[in-house]
Each structure stands twice: as structure tokens, then as C-alpha cells.
Regions:
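N-terminal basic, amphipathic alpha-helical segments
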Residues: 1-133, 137, 142, 146, ...
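Helix-loop "lid/cap" segments that line or gate small-molecule binding pockets
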Residues: 157, 327, 355-363
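Conserved core of the PLP fold type I
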Residues: 139-277, 288-306, 310, 377
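Active-site PLP attachment segment
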Residues: 76, 302-337
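A generic "structured core" feature
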Residues: 207-210, 276, 280, 290, ...
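Short glycine-rich anion-binding loops that position phosphate/pyrophosphate groups of nucleotides
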Residues: 115, 251-255, 317
Length: 471
């Protein structure tokens, strides 16, 4: 069956990531009846070419829609509109011959590493939020607040970063954002001029690339090895490409491979950035979740004075993706430029939420939650590692990560894309290496984000994974 031609109605300047705008446009076409159940969609390469976007962006949109149940993939055939669409879909106005309702398969997903929202300290958060809503500061406030965020949270974060990560953060140098994604966009707007480039890890984080492109920068991939970003390759890229004005790294638990950059390479990276006069954007991804040994200090904790370093973090990974709270620390004039860009797109943050989270930090509730979550996620990591070894030991290999909420699974003589397609048909959503590739050949690997699955769900997911292994 030929694929349906798609002329998607996508906003010219979407407020969020481009892949979500593409996913929303496809969803609208399904709900309007333009895309019928069972219709075949164009391949990711063809649709990317038609839309003028990177193939990874379309792949991310398809993966999102498969996770939500709008699409499904069939090995060697393609991607199709689901026959059993999500219950939220409105019934079409004109109905053809009635069919028997399709059986809805239980759906599981190895996410990209999202936390489990079931673990949110909801009672403590609700109490703190209620106090914030009833406080004189909120009820008596008749004007907008500071675009950099509420002073109470900036002071609380300053203490938290100093005690938990060894980062000396003056509250005046902190900017509160709606998640780390906004912080990355603002960092690029402040550090890079249109036409300049940001060096990024490859394989790496596609949503960061989207944020940088939206800010007017191009991205250039730098290979990642067992020690993280290759500083030698970065040096060569800077010397050959004068457009590179910044480098983006996730040194603590590299996304997606989970490797940790060692101390010697960190020092070499800081030296390279300083010598070439570029900006370092450090995304301290999953710092909270270190299971063996002490967490490695961030680059921001040992950077020489005056280095243009933008440090990005998030409280969303400690709580839930739906609680949008990120932050950035930067020197002047970078911070002023970031705050001005933030004010232009989002006048200020959520003052009651910021006050509530400041309460959780000061009262110790956030620290207690982090310790509890680490114990639970460590147990889930161990269950996943044991199940993978028992079911797939001869066909795959992996290093048990010392931290983070995902596992990087290397495939032995197996197509990761084909495996992901087969698993999707069986009811398990996977993220293959193509999702994280920029310019180079995609790694034959799968990123298994396990944190949002309990131990029973992990066992069922690994069973589907093993049964879906291509011959």
C-alpha cells in the first residue's frame, strides 16, 4: 500500500520543539479524518526531505506518536496510523461500515530516561504550594516579578548547588526557567550569533540541537567515546571551523551513552575552551542519580575564573517532567542577555511553584525525596541489568551505568531500527541509535530508560524485547 502524501500544517515558529509541532500536525490530520486508520505514512527520510528538516526530527515525532498510541510500526512495511486510536480521539462525523473494536494491547515504553511521576512527594509539594498561594508575598503582589526568577528560589538553589555539587553560585548569577530545554535555548541565544555554530556530542541529545537551531545556531557533531566527548576531535573541529563559538556537553552521564567524563579529560576540555575563547554550555544531566561512589564535581565547580561557562540544570528530573523547573548559572554579560531573551518569550516564571520548590529545598524534603528515589532507581537498574543478561546475554552487551536513569544497550550483529520496529508492533516503544545521530552513522544501540517502569513492568518489557529480537 502506498504511503499517504502529507502536506502538514505546521506553525512557522512553533513555541516548543519542532518534533512536537510535527507530531501535533499529524494528530490533527488523524482527528479530522484526513489520515484514516491503517493509512501508511511516508518514511522518515522522505517526510524530512519534504518538510526541510533533519530526519531525526521526524523520527522523534513518529516515536512520540507511537508512544501515545496514534501510530504503530510494522517491520519491513513502514509506519501506519493505528487501527485502535487513543480514546481521546473524537468520533468522525461520517462513519463507514461498523467494525469490531480492536483489542488494545498493553503498552510499555523504555523512555529516554524520564523519572517516575508516581514517586513525586505529592503531599509535601501540595503543602508547600498551598503555603505559597496563601503567602502575603503572592497575594499582595500587584506587579510582574523578576524575569530571572523569584529571589527566594534563587537563594535556595544557591545553597543547594554549593552543598550538593560544590558549585559556588551567587543568586544574582542564577536564572530560573521552565525546564532545562528553555535554559538551553536561552544559552544559545546569549552565547552564539546567527551563522555561528555550537559543537555538540554525537551521539547526543536531539532536543538540545533543536533548541540551538531555534536560537539561530547551527550544530556540528563531535564524536563521543568511552570517556565522553573527544576533546582531540573538538580541538580539530575548532581549528577547521571558525564558526564554532560554543560547545555543549553532558559530562556527568552523557546523553545517550551514560558514560562519565573523567577528571583528566575534564581539565583538558576546560583548557581547550579557555585557549580558544569559546563558551562552554554544561548540561549537568542526571547529576542527582549517582548510584556508585560520589558524584563527580561539575565542570562549573572547577572552571577558572572568567571562563564563559553556562551551567544548566533541572529540578524536573528530581520530580516529574510535568513540573517544569530548570535553571542556569552564567557570568555577565551572558546572564543579562539570557534574562532579556527570556523576558521576550515568557515574562516571568510560575511564582507560586518557585516559592513551593524553594520550601522543599529549605525544609529538606527535596533531599529526602532524592535519597529515596536513588534507592528505588538503583534497584530498578539492577533488575533491568539482570533481566537483560538472563534473556539476551549472548546477543547484546552493556556496561551497568554508575548512575543516570537509562542503560545504553549495544546490539551484536542486529539492526537496532528493525528491533525497535518489531518491539513497537508487540507493544514496547524503544529509542534506537538513529534517534541520537547527527552526521555520522547511527550507532547500533538502544537507549533503555527504565526509571518510569516498576520492577514488574521491567520484567514484561524485557520479555517483549527478547521475543522481538530479529533473527
Amino acid at each position: 500500500m502506498a504511503s499517504e502524501p502529507l502536506a502538514l500544517d505546521i506553525e512557522k515558529e512553533p513555541s516548543g520543539p519542532l518534533f512536537l509541532a510535527i507530531a501535533d500536525a499529524i494528530t490533527r490530520d488523524i482527528m479530522r479524518g484526513r489520515l484514516k486508520p491503517g493509512a501508511r505514512l511516508p518514511g522518515t527520510r522522505a517526510l524530512a526531505r519534504a518538510l526541510g528538516v533533519h530526519r531525526n526530527t521526524v523520527d522523534a515525532a513518529y516515536q512520540e506518536l507511537m508512544t501515545q498510541g496514534w501510530l504503530h510500526a510494522e517491520p519491513a512495511r513502514g509506519t501506519f496510523v493505528a487501527e485502535d486510536l487513543p480514546e481521546s480521539m473524537a468520533e468522525p462525523v461520517s462513519v463507514s461500515v461498523p467494525r469490531e473494536p480492536a483489542t488494545v494491547r498493553p503498552h510499555l515504553a523504555f523512555s529516554d530516561g524520564a523519572p517516575d511521576p508516581r514517586l513525586v512527594p505529592d503531599k509535601a509539594l501540595a503543602r508547600a504550594f498551598r503555603r505559597a498561594l496563601l503567602s502575603p508575598a503572592f497575594r499582595g503582589g500587584a506587579d510582574y516579578g523578576d524575569a530571572r526568577g523569584t529571589p527566594v528560589l534563587r537563594h535556595a538553589l544557591s545553597s543547594y548547588l554549593a552543598s550538593d555539587r560544590g558549585v559556588v553560585a551567587d543568586p544574582a548569577r542564577l536564572l530560573i526557567t521552565r525546564g532545562s530545554q528553555m535554559a538551553l535555548f536561552l544559552a544559545a541565544r546569549a552565547a552564539v550569533k546567527p551563522g555561528q555554530a555550537i559543537a555538540v556530542e554525537e551521539p547526543g541529545y536531539p532536543l538540545a540541537w533543536e533548541a540551538f537551531r531555534a536560537a539561530g545556531a547551527s550544530v556540528r557533531g563531535i564524536p563521543v567515546d568511552a570517556g565522553g566527548l573527544s576533546v582531540a576531535a573538538l580541538e580539530a573541529a575548532i581549528e577547521s571551523d571558525p564558526r564554532i563559538a560554543a560547545v555543549y556537553v553532558t559530562p556527568h552521564h552523557q546523553y545517550p551513552t551514560t558514560v562519565t567524563m573523567g577528571a583528566a579529560r575534564r581539565l583538558k576540555l576546560l583548557d581547550t575552551v579557555e585557549r580558544h575563547g569559546i563558551t562552554l554550555i554544561e548540561d549537568d544531566y542526571d547529576h542527582e542519580y549517582r548510584f556508585e561512589g560520589r558524584p563527580v564535581l561539575p565542570l562549573a565547580a572547577r572552571a577558572p575564573a572568567g571562563l564563559p561557562l553556562i551551567y544548566v540544570g533541572s529540578l524536573s528530573k528530581l520530580l516529574s517532567p510535568g513540573i517544569r523547573l530548570g535553571y542556569a548559572m552564567a557570568p555577565e554579560p551572558l546572564l543579562t542577555r539570557m534574562a532579556a531573551a527570556r523576558a521576550a518569550i515568557d515574562r516571568q516564571g510560575d511564582a507560586p511553584l518557585e516559592a513551593a520548590l524553594a520550601d522543599l529545598i529549605r525544609d529538606g524534603d527535596l533531599g529526602r525525596h532524592a535519597r529515596k528515589a536513588r534507592r528505588i532507581y538503583r534497584a530498578r537498574r539492577d533488575v533491568l541489568a539482570s533481566a537483560l543478561s538472563a534473556h539476551l546475554g549472548g546477543r547484546i552487551f552493556f556496561d551497568r551505568p554508575a548512575g543516570g536513569l537509562a542503560l545504553w544497550l549495544h546490539c551484536e550483529n542486529v539492526s537496532a531500527d528493525a528491533w525497535a520496529e518489531r518491539a513497537g508492533v508487540a507493544g514496547l516503544a524503544l529509542l534506537p541509535g538513529t534517534h541520537f545521530a547527527l552526521d555520522r552513522a547511527a550507532p547500533q544501540a538502544l537507549r533503555l530508560g527504565y526509571a518510569a517502569l516498576d520492577e514488574g513492568q521491567i520484567a514484561r518489557a524485557v520479555d517483549i524485547l527478547a521475543r522481538s529480537l530479529p533473527d
